[in-house]
């Protein structure tokens, strides 16, 4: 099985070390462009663009990278409860059209009540997943070309429709990650690819089996992906030294503050990440070559595969054997590590190299009539 390898645009900051200004660098448009173009040339399938108040806006960043890349896809967040499903569907179709079919979408429900309140969202965990399920139903139906009437608890639309369809048919793929039962149920019913953070293989296997069984109950099959950091070097010793350097400026106070911030979230996935290290620096290798040091201060994906190229490739293939076909990777700093992964890891894997998409001709059209419909020729009888 050929593997889809993704990279990451660090719109929330970048540098050589975690938890310090030491060795940091400015993340401006030029720097993000360098990373995107490196990923484009090296054969990555796409890049994940993060979302939230600590990041630059993912949609604007993705749009700005379209003209400077050729085949790279952009995995951008959909935010139920923050954006209406109709507006999100129009945005998604436009991004897909402007990128010539290089748009992918990541459903993000949110997990930090404090940040969500700042965005005007006051739903609890269960309610957010209810809202996400309704949002996704409307979003998908619109992109499928339907005129949608929907009266739910959280979404209510009447006569909603898209005038401009996406390039990818039936619609651009929808990604989603969540570890709670209600999250897995949403994934099983509605998404195309289920993402998990980098837990030990036996725990990932459990999640895949659970989601696969739930999807089968809906008569569906879905794909699987995993989100991991990577520290790859020419030798295993060099890789582990690099891992230790990454957290060499971390002090206990910074770790404690980070863990306290994570504790206020209601994310089951974040709780599982925190349980891998319990906020302690000792015994961070939680599974062969799987290191939890990143999660001491970084929310979300908190583990890294560490080793030389063949070693890391072997671990990736272990996950692939569980049914994972997409790997969303990152490393610090992201420009240098994009090259290291491409040069030291890719030669040991069966990497699916994306082709440059051929331009898709759009149907000619006049201006929309009354902002309501596109004029079409009437067939002569």
Swiss-Prot record:
Flavoprotein listed as a keyword: yes
CDD domains, per database record: Alkanesulfonate_monoxygenase
Keywords recorded for this protein, A-Z: Flavoprotein, FMN, Monooxygenase, Oxidoreductase
Stored InterPro entries: Alkanesulphonate_mOase_FMN-dep, Luciferase-like_dom, Luciferase-like_sf, SsuD_RutA_monooxygenase
Pfam families the UniProt entry points to: Bac_luciferase (PF00296)
SUPFAM superfamilies per record: Bacterial luciferase-like
Membrane-spanning segments: none
Record keyword Ion transport present: no
Broadest EC class assigned to this enzyme: oxidoreductase
GO MF terms, alphabetically ordered: alkanesulfonate monooxygenase activity
Self-association state and partner proteins as the record states: Homotetramer.
Remaining remarks: FMNH(2) which is absolutely required for this enzymatic reaction, is provided by SsuE.
Sequence similarity: Belongs to the SsuD family.
Protein name listed in UniProt: Alkanesulfonate monooxygenase
Organism (species): Shigella flexneri serotype 5b (strain 8401)
Gene that specifies this protein: ssuD
């Amino acid at each position: 099985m050929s593997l889809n390898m993704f990279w990451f645009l660090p719109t929330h900051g970048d540098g050589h070390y975690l938890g310090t200004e030491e060795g940091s660098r400015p993340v401006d448009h030029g720097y993000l462009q360098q990373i995107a173009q490196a990923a484009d040339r090296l054969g990555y399938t796409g890049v994940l663009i993060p979302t939230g108040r600590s990041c630059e806006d993912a949609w604007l960043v993705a749009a700005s990278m379209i003209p400077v890349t050729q085949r790279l896809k952009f995995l951008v967040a959909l935010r139920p409860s923050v954006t209406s499903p109709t507006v999100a569907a129009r945005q998604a179709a436009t991004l897909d059209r402007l990128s010539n079919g290089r748009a992918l979408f990541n459903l993000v429900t949110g997990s930090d009540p404090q940040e969500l309140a700042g965005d005007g969202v006051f739903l609890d965990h269960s309610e957010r997943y209810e809202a996400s399920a309704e949002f996704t139903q409307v979003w998908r139906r619109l992109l499928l070309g339907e005129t949608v009437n929907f009266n739910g608890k959280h979404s209510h639309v009447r006569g909603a429709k898209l005038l401009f369809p996406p390039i990818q048919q039936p619609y651009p793929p929808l990604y989603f990650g969540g570890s709670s039962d209600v999250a897995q149920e949403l994934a099983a019913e509605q998404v195309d690819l289920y993402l998990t953070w980098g837990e030990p293989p036996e725990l990932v296997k459990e999640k895949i089996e659970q989601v696969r069984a739930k999807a089968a109950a809906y008569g569906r099959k879905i794909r699987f992906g995993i989100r991991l950091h990577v520290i790859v070097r020419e030798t295993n010793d060099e890789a582990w030294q690099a891992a230790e350097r990454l957290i060499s400026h971390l002090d206990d106070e910074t770790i404690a503050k980070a863990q306290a911030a994570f504790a206020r979230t209601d994310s089951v996935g974040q709780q599982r990440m925190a349980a891998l290290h319990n906020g302690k620096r000792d015994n961070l290798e939680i599974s062969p070559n799987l290191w939890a040091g990143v999660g001491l201060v970084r929310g979300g994906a908190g583990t890294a595969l560490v080793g030389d190229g063949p070693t890391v490739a072997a671990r990736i293939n272990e996950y692939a054997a569980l049914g994972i076909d997409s790997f969303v990777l990152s490393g610090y700093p992201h420009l240098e590590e994009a090259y290291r992964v491409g040069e030291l890891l890719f030669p040991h894997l069966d990497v699916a190299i994306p082709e440059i998409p051929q331009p898709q001709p759009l149907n000619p059209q006049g201006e929309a009539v009354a902002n309501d419909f596109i004029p079409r020729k009437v067939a002569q009888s």
